[in-house]
Amino acid sequence: MAAITASMVAELRGKTDAPMMECKKALTEAGGDMAKAEELLRIKLGTKAGKAAARITAEGVVACHIDGTRGALIEVNSETDFVSKNDSFLQLARAAAELVARHQPADIAALGALAYEQDGFGPTLEDVRKGLIGKIGENMVLRRFRYFGAGHRLVSYLHGTRIGVVVEFDGDATVAKDVAMHIAAMKPVALSSAGVPAELIAAERSVAAAKAAEDKARAEAEGRPVQSDDIVAKRIEGAVHKYLKDVALFNQAFVKNDKQTVEQVLKAAGTTVKGFALYVVGEGMEKKVDDFAAEVAAQVAAAKAAVT
């Protein structure tokens, strides 16, 4: 089994907000598997273990470009936060978003093949990317993009350079902008419950079932009454219902007025949201977590060895 290091415990705590000892126990039980340990914590501690899942550590920027009813949202990644603030890197990201909006490329490869020159590099976007890698000395990747061109109005919201939202709508632009800000804050995964991916619902049901099974085993061990299968089933479905309410945009309480749902706010304003895209830099990506203490210790040991 892999040794459980302090940096692993810290990483898991950063992802889950769980107590340090619980993180260590989960990692030990999972044999050092970070994903499995996170799942174990969700079962043991409930939904609060997933609240910090959006604390993404990969670097880069999100950029957008809107031109009338055409627009684009794109994520461009770098290795360090320092490079993500580099002017040439930022220019590349903004240019890539504009190229997507103008040309509607089929994929990243098609985007890279589009004509573009910057900083003496070209004649394609991919050539510029490779040139900047050599110039700056750090890898950078055009990770993903979303094109909008269905003929609806568009509005965007950028929270710094790490969170970006584009909303397709018909109606009041001010309300649509507020909804874009809401999406950045609340991070829904779909417009309505019907649009939530089946695999996410299945995963949530699995976590709720595992939590119920653990509670049953604990009750039996302690000699307490065990919930009936009917109650357990209702409990599991209740957890799924709550999850759908939490992650479907229309069901969410509006951030600027939690007495109303987003759906109610839109209806009152005569506005409809047709779709949206939300990008968070590094979402779903792994990033190397350096054990700084171990690194320093290794450097000290190497220095001592050099002296002797």
UniProtKB/Swiss-Prot annotation:
Pfam families assigned to the protein according to its UniProt record, in alphabetical order: EF_TS (PF00889)
Region (Involved in Mg(2+) ion dislocation from EF-Tu): 80-83
PROSITE patterns named in the record: EF_TS_2
Kinase keyword on record: no
Transmembrane segments: none
Keywords: Cytoplasm, Elongation factor, Protein biosynthesis
Subcellular location: Cytoplasm
SUPFAM superfamilies per UniProt: Elongation factor Ts (EF-Ts), dimerisation domain, UBA-like
MF (Gene Ontology): translation elongation factor activity
Top-level lineage group: Bacteria
Ranges in coiled-coil conformation: none
CDD domains reported for this sequence: UBA_EF-Ts (cd14275)
Cellular component GO terms held in the UniProt record: cytoplasm
Biological role stated in the UniProt entry: Associates with the EF-Tu.GDP complex and induces the exchange of GDP to GTP. It remains bound to the aminoacyl-tRNA.EF-Tu.GTP complex up to the GTP hydrolysis stage on the ribosome.
Homology family: Belongs to the EF-Ts family.
Name under which the protein is recorded: Elongation factor Ts
Annotated source species: Verminephrobacter eiseniae (strain EF01-2)
Classification of source organism: Bacteria, Pseudomonadati, Pseudomonadota, Betaproteobacteria, Burkholderiales
